[in-house]
């Protein structure tokens, strides 16, 4: 038997041995520490692994076990999932690859042809797949949702979410909830009208759609000036969270359009820059909380929600915590959406604070003007889409934080909208003498107080990841992959990957050994303890 045939037979055996991922397995993902079954590791958005074979005492013995270079030259923003020893990862724009999680040996690759006229704001990227049963689900930059056979990469169904020619795309990893695939969309910079969709996992038929901008006559439409709601943005371009006990999906919404010009869309612009809580079965709105009303700065609420059950002021509460792009850390009751507290975690000059009702107190002098106004944080925010992590052991939230400013200048005159074209209302610039700084920060989960921080040379675009070994893993723009003591931020280990890190690490176990995988540059790097 030749080598290639042997490899093919072994691959077929490994793929066949991988178990079906039921909804019950997803509900109990924490009980399967050897797998990484969802984008955030669990429905609560924790990015926490219960594995502790790799820990503070032996992390210096980490070494690279394998690397896999993608064919795409674009940076990876994917979060791989791992199911029973099989890793599934995406590469730009919309390829999926199945790998042996122990060796990096590829099993199959799905390659999708993307139309030449696809336009996206910030790169033709993809952040991952979702699995249910033996099917993988992926959104595409030409605004489709695709179901693939996890054993072969064969297309099972392919449905259009919406018309990409109007500026829509799907870049986020979907979220499986019961028998539905929840899909958000990108395109806020094109003046789209945002929505969140649910699709039947078996057939691909759409089950419900929630528009993040209320239509004419609907509650909330009065928060938009005239017809500005029709091109108001509020996309849903980062994966959300789910509470099965409450049957609520929590999802962040993006900035109102056009960017950097609030005067032509006067009002709060609901439900932009918000967290929305939707009934998982119907898509009906249960509650919302808006972080930045009438946003003139482009501060999407594009962060993964973190759900925490904790005692708050002497009472057990179901909480949702959020380190927002606007530089404030929020604690809300996730049953009702009640605002509980907020604290700035990065330098900010735009607000005098958050009032007792949870509404920001804008500083009038910080509103953008045609002459330009210097405001902290800058247009990309105090943090961005890259995921935070939460450890139930330390009760800390770990966030990649930026400290910098932009000069905001809105355009004057008419701003006509053309479907499929960029819809900008101004321009932000960075002061030459102040490029800004960055850090990994550990925040108290209930107050947002900074407990420790580790400075970075540049504004890193990677998320954090934490383990039961009390290690926080993080990568930066220089390609350094680092492990910190989760309690005090001490740097314990560092390796160079040679590529910009623009994603988060994950951990899993195969044949009794723990591994850590990091997407960096256009490659996957996997580390384990030296044998």
Q: What is the role of each PLM region?
A:
Residues 68-79, 109-130, 158-173, 190, ...:
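Extracytoplasmic beta-rich repeat domains
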Residues 33-34, 84-85, 133-134, 178-180, ...:
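Short coil/turn segments that connect the beta-strands within blades of beta-propeller domains
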Residues 21-64, 212-219, 359-364, 429-430, ...:
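Blade/loop signatures of beta-propeller domains
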Residues 45, 49-162, 467:
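N-terminal cofactor/phosphate-binding cores enriched in small/glycine residues
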Residues 148, 194-205, 268-283, 335-337, ...:
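Beta-propeller blade signature
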Residues 503-531:
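Blade-level signature of beta-propeller repeat domains, shared across WD40, Kelch, NHL, RCC1
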Residues 309, 402, 432-490:
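Loop/turn-rich, solvent-exposed surfaces of beta-rich toroidal or solenoidal domains
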């Amino acid at each position: 038997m030749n080598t290639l045939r042997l490899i093919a037979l072994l691959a077929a055996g490994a793929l066949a041995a991988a178990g079906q991922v039921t909804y019950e397995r997803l509900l109990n993902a924490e009980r399967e520490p050897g797998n990484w079954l969802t984008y955030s590791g669990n429905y609560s958005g924790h990015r926490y692994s219960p594995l502790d074979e790799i820990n503070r005492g032996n992390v210096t013995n980490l070494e690279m076990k394998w690397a896999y270079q993608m064919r795409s030259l674009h940076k990876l923003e994917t979060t791989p999932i791992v199911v029973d020893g099989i890793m599934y990862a995406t590469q730009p724009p919309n390829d999926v690859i199945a790998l042996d999680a122990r060796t990096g040996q590829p099993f199959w690759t799905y390659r999708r042809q993307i139309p030449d006229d696809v336009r996206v704001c910030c790169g033709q990227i993809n952040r991952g797949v979702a699995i249910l049963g033996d099917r993988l689900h992926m959104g595409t930059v030409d605004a489709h949702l695709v179901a693939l056979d996890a054993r072969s990469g064969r297309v099972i169904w392919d449905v259009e979410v919406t018309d990409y020619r109007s500026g829509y795309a799907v870049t986020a990893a979907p979220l499986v909830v019961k028998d539905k695939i929840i899909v958000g969309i990108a395109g806020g910079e094109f003046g789209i009208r945002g929505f969140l969709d649910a699709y039947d996992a078996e057939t691909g038929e759409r089950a419900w759609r929630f528009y993040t901008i209320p239509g004419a006559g609907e509650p909330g439409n009065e928060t938009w000036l005239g017809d500005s709601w029709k091109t108001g943005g509020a996309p849903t371009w980062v994966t959300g969270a789910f509470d099965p006990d409450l049957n609520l999906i929590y999802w962040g919404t993006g900035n109102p359009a056009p960017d950097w010009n609030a005067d032509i869309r006067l009002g709060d612009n609901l439900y932009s820059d918000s967290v929305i809580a939707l009934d998982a079965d119907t898509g009906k709105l249960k509650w919302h909380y808006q972080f930045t009303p009438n946003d003139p700065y482009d501060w999407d609420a594009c962060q993964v929600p973190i759900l925490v059950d904790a005692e708050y002021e002497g009472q057990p509460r179901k909480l949702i915590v959020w380190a927002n792009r606007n530089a404030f850390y929020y604690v809300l009751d996730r049953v009702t959406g009640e605002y509980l507290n907020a604290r700035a975690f990065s330098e900010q000059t735009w607000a005098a604070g958050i009032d007792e009702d949870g509404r920001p107190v804008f500083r009038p002098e910080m509103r953008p003007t045609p002459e330009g106004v210097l405001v902290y944080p800058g247009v990309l925010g105090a943090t961005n889409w890259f995921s935070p992590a939460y450890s139930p052991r330390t009760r800390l939230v770990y966030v990649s934080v930026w400290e910098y400013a932009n000069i905001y200048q809105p355009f004057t005159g008419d701003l006509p909208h053309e479907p499929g074209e960029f819809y900008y209302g101004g321009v932000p610039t960075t002061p030459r003498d102040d490029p800004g700084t960055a850090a990994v920060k550990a925040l108290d989960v209930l107050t947002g107080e900074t407990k420790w921080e580790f400075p970075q040379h540049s504004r890193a675009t990677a998320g954090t990841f934490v383990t039961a070994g009390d290690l926080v893993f993080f990568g930066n723009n220089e390609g350094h992959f680092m492990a910190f003591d989760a309690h005090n931020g001490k740097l314990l280990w560092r390796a160079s990957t040679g590529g910009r890190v623009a994603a988060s690490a994950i951990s899993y176990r195969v044949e009794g050994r723990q591994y850590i995988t990091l997407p960096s540059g256009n490659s996957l790097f996997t580390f384990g303890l030296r044998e």
